[in-house]
Amino acid sequence: MEKWYVAAKKADFDKWAKEFHISPVTARILRNRDLTEESQIRKFLYGKLEDCYSPWLLKDMDRAVEEILKAVKEGLHIRVIGDYDVDGICSSYILTKGFQMLGAQVDTAIPHRIHDGYGLNEHLIEEAKREGVGMIVTCDNGIAAAPQIELANSLGMRVVVTDHHEVPYIEENGERKEQLPPALAVVDPKRSDCSYPFQGICGGVVALKVIQAITEKTGNPGLINIQDELLEFAALSTVCDVMELKDENRILVKEGLKRIQKGYNEGLKALMEVNEIAPDRLSAYHLGFVLGPCLNATGRLDTAKRALELLQSFTRADAMTAARELKDLNESRKNLTVQGIQRADTYIQEHHMTEDKVMVIYLPEVHESIAGIIAGKVREKYHHPVFILTKGEDGVKGSGRSIEAYHMYDAMTQVKQFFTKYGGHKLAAGLSMREEDIEPLRTALNEKCTLMEDDFIPRVHIDVAMPMGYADDALAGELALLEPFGTGNPKPLFAQKDLIFQAGFKMGANKTCAKFRVKTPEGNTQTLVFFGDLERLGAFLNEKYGIGSEEALYAGRGSFPLSVVYQVGQNTYKGRTEVQYIMQNYC
C-alpha cells in the first residue's frame, strides 16, 4: 500500500490569493509546486514566450551557429542525425526544417533501433562520408559519441553536437571529469560549464534554441515564419521525453498546444484526426499518451523515418494515409506490450526477484523496442528500479526505468565494465551488453544499491485535505490555470476521510470504470468516478468489510467508510459542464 502525505509548506496564502485573484486553495497548490516568489507564481500562471531564456545562454551556441552558417555558405551537404524516439524525431524535424529555410543542402538520418542502435555509430559516419556529407549535426544524441565523432573528424567531416543527455565522466581523485566529444561545438545544457538557467530541457527544445539563435543572427524571413510550427514539436518532445513541466518547459508546452490546435502541420493534424482528438480538447495527456506513442511505434516496430515522413507530408491525403498506418502500428505495439508485461511478471515470480532492490529481468523473446515500456510498467507495479533486457541481433540490449530515490545513470556508471554501450539520466537509461554478464550485473547493481525499504513504498503527496463539497465550479475552473499537467506538475490531489460508500455502478464498454454514490461526514451526497483497478478495489472491500461487500455495494446496499484521495475536474456532456470528482486512492 502507499504512504499518504499532506503537504504542509508555509506561505501567506491569503496574500497570494488577493494578489493573483485566486482562491487560497489554489495558492496552497502553487506553494506545493515549490514556488515561493511572486515573480515565480506570475510566470507559472501567466508566463509568455518572452519569459523563456535566450538561446545564447547555452554554452557553445555561438560556435554552433557560426559553424552551421559557415557550412551553409560553403554549400556543404549537411546531415542531421537524430534518434528513433519522439524527441529524436521531432528534433530532427526542427533542425532539418530550419536548415531548409536557410537554403541549405540538408537531409536527415535516423538510426534504426535494431540495426544501428542508439545515436551515432561508425556505420552512419561511414555512410555519410560515402554520400558526400560535409557536416553532421546531431540532435538528441552525440554527447556520448566521442569515438564516432573522432572518426568523422578523421574523414574530414565537421560535427556539431546538440543534445540534452548527461555528459559522460570519469572519476579522478574523487572528482568528476567530464568527457566532451571532440566536435566543433557541443550544445548541451547539462555541461557543467553551461550557465543556462534550466537544465531540464529535451533534445527538441535544444534544437529549437539552435534555430532561434540562427533566426536572431540572420533575420531570415523563412525562419521567422516557421517559429510557430517548430514550437509544436518542441512541446511534443518535452511531454513525450517526460521532462518536468516546470520553468520554461511549462510555457513551451502551453504555447505549443495552442499552435497544435491551430493545425500548422498536416501530419500532426492527420494524427489527431485518426485518433479522434478534437483540437479544442487537446491536452498534454494527448501528446504523451496518444500522439506520442503513434510516432514512437515506428521506431519500435518499423523505422522512425516513417514518423518523420508523416510530419513532412505536404498534402492531407498523404498525411492521412501515413497517420492511419502509424495508428495501426501502435495497436500492434500495445498487444506486444501486454504480452511482455505478463512475461516480466512471470520472470519476477520464478526468480524470486521481489527480494532484489534493483530488478534485472532478461526476456530474450521480447522485442527490444518495447523494453522501455515494459520496464516502466513493472516499475509502476513494484516501485523498484527495473532493467528489462532482451536478445538483440548483436548481444543483449535493454532499457531501465527508475524511482525518484535512485539515480540510474550514476548507478550504471559505477558498474560500466558490464556495458558495451550505455547512456541516459536519473530516471531512464538504455544499454547494450554481453549475455554472459547479465547475472554479474544483477549482483553488482544490488550490492552497490543503497536504497532502504522505505524507498520502495509509493508516496502519495496530497495538496489539500478538504471536503469534496468545497471543490465547486469556481475552483474546478480555476484549477485549469495550473495546466498543462504532467511530470513535475501533477494534477492537484485532495483528500477526505470517512466517506460512506453507498452504491456503485460499473460503466464503459468493458465495465472497467465505475461511479460511486458516497455520503460525506457533512451529510451531503456526492458522486465519485473511478478509472482504476476495480478488481483490486473489490478485493479490498471484501477483505476489509467481509465477503460479499463488493456485491452489496453494486447492489446499492453499501455502508462502507473509506478515506479517499481525489482529483477535481470538469465534465462536459450535451453542452452542460459540471464538477467531476475522480477517486485516485483509497484506504
List each language-model region with its residue ranges:
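Non-catalytic interface/linker regions that flank or bridge core catalytic/transmembrane domains
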Residues: K3-Y5
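Residue-level marker for buried hydrophobic side chains located in beta-strands
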Residues: V80, V137, V160-V161, T238, ...
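Histidine-centered active-site/metal-ligand motif
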Residues: H164-H165, H367, H425, C513
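Mid-to-C-terminal polyanion-binding domains and interfaces
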Residues: K70-H77, D318-R324, D328-Y362, Q414-C587
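A residue-level signal for conserved active-site and pocket-lining positions in enzyme catalytic cores
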Residues: L30, V137, N296, L479, ...
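A short acidic, amphipathic alpha-helical/loop segment
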Residues: P147-L151, M359, I374, E478
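Active-site cavity-forming subdomains of large catalytic enzyme subunits
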Residues: E126-G204, L208-N220, N225, E229
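Hydrophobic helix-and-loop "lid/oligomerization" segment in the mid-to-C-terminal part
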Residues: A7-G134, L155, N173-R176, P182, ...
